[in-house]
């Protein structure tokens, strides 16, 4: 099982050109499934796994209170693996094709008000870490890029003259993301007054090209970024469950509330399908309903 799984991951990296972050998610999901089949059924070959075994795995996930979207993602990973193994003639048939995908719950994205965003962005201090964190928060909100996209930014991806970032999104698709004046000012402050101090901590002979650095002068991790965002959320006493992705949701929602065209927002977010962007129109409708019910005398 392990060798076939590793071959599949190499296929995703080499042939599909998927990002390290996406391949890592495939690895985690499929390793969990592999361990389940080993421990529960003593199955050690993918060719031995039937659709009934996969159903048991899905039932296990449901018992563990995994969200439907997470379960659907794990099943999708299994299907992709089985499709690959069938094509490579490592298994006789693709039994995963017999399973229906769990219906995803259509959750409205969590987003902040403009006032809450301002409080969050102004929470970091004036030390090197605070200047870095403020720049990170500004970039999230002003550009709407994903966590993985921000994490992967190098100095050469930033053009201060034009005010654009070159980001690599899902499927290794590159796009330009505009930065507003506030984000540019925060980045310049970080570049001139904080990044050089952090870079001094780097013991490596080679310079680090990463835009955002940690206390060791190397690229900050995605986990650390999440942790820093959570810290400032707690400081501002926000009632929302805020993550870096919440700032992306806020970016899209505030653009639409300001009258932006849905197609333009799709381009800015890097969505392949406009149906993914349309969920933000539901957010606006929910907001309008709330305002109407609260303030209209005939509601």
UniProtKB/Swiss-Prot annotation:
Q: What molecular function terms (GO) are annotated for this protein?
A: DNA binding; tyrosine-based site-specific recombinase activity
Catalytic residues of the enzyme: 146, 170, 245, 248, 271, 280 (o-(3'-phospho-dna)-tyrosine intermediate)
Concerning PROSITE patterns, the annotation shows: CB, TYR_RECOMBINASE
Coiled coil start-end: none
Q: Which residues form the Core-binding (CB) domain?
A: 1-86
Q: Name a single GO cellular component.
A: cytoplasm
Give the main location: cytoplasm
NCBIfam families listed in its UniProt record: PRK00283.1 (NF001399), recomb_XerC (TIGR02224)
Oligomeric and partner information: Forms a cyclic heterotetrameric complex composed of two molecules of XerC and two molecules of XerD.
Could you identify this protein by its name?
A: Tyrosine recombinase XerC
Organism lineage reads as: Bacteria, Bacillati, Bacillota, Clostridia, Natranaerobiales
Q: Which gene encodes it?
A: xerC
């Amino acid at each position: 099982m392990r060798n076939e799984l590793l071959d599949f991951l190499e296929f995703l990296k080499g042939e599909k050109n998927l990002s390290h972050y996406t391949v890592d998610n495939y690895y985690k999901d499929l390793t969990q499934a592999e361990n389940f089949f080993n421990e529960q059924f003593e199955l050690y070959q993918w060719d031995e796994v039937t659709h009934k075994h996969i159903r048991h795995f899905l039932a296990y996930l449901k018992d563990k209170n995994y969200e439907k979207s997470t379960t659907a993602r794990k099943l999708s990973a299994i299907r992709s693996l089985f499709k690959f193994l069938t094509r490579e003639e490592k298994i006789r048939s693709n039994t995963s094709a017999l399973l229906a995908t769990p219906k995803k719950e259509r959750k409205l994205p969590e987003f902040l008000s403009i006032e809450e965003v301002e409080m969050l962005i102004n929470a970091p201090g004036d030390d090197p870490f605070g200047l870095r964190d403020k720049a990170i928060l500004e970039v999230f909100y002003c550009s709407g890029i994903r966590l993985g996209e921000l994490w992967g930014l190098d100095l050469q991806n930033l053009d201060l003259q034009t005010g654009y970032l070159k980001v690599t999104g899902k499927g290794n698709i590159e796009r330009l993301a505009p930065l507003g004046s506030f984000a540019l000012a925060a980045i310049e402050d970080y570049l001139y007054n904080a990044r050089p101090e952090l870079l001094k901590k780097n013991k490596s002979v080679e310079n680090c090209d990463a835009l955002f650095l940690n206390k060791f002068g190397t690229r900050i991790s995605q986990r650390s970024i999440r942790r820093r965002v959570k810290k400032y959320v707690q400081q501002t006493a926000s009632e929302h469950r805020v993550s870096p992705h919440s700032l992306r949701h806020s970016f899209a929602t505030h653009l639409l509330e300001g009258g932006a065209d849905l197609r333009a927002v799709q381009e800015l977010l890097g969505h392949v399908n406009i149906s993914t962007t349309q969920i933000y129109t539901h957010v606006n409708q929910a907001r309008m309903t709330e305002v109407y019910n609260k303030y209209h005398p005939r509601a």
